[in-house]
């Protein structure tokens, strides 16, 4: 069951981080700098290859995401639907 949540977070975060990067009009390299990570790691996040860690999520919410509460509410909804699909 935990794997479902991890996959949901990976997809959700990938979509959000890519959306905000495009909205800000910055490159993957610039986003990597803002999130204090390597370009390769950021590229993997942006493309849904890997999931974010706690520090990356915290940096995203505090430095990039304009509405962290809305982001977390949407993530909660995604997790809630994950619960329904695994029952």
Task: Label each region the model flagged.
Residues 1-23:
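A short, Lys/Arg-rich alpha-helix, primarily the initiator
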Residues 2, 70-87:
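Short, charged recognition helix plus adjacent turn
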Residues 16, 27, 53-56:
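Residues that mark the N-terminal boundary/hinge immediately upstream of a DNA-recognition element
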Residues 25-43:
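Short alpha-helical DNA-recognition segment
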Residues 55-73:
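DNA major-groove recognition helix of helix-turn-helix/homeodomain DNA-binding modules
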């Amino acid at each position: 069951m935990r794997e479902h949540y991890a996959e949901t977070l990976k997809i959700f975060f990938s979509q959000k981080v890519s959306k905000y990067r495009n909205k800000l009009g910055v490159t993957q390299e610039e986003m990597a700098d803002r999130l204090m990570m390597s370009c390769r790691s950021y590229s993997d996040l942006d493309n849904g290859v890997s999931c974010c860690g706690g520090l990356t999520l915290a940096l995203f919410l505090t430095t990039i995401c304009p509405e962290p509460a809305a982001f977390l509410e949407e993530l909660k909804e995604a997790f809630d639907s994950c619960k329904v699909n695994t029952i």
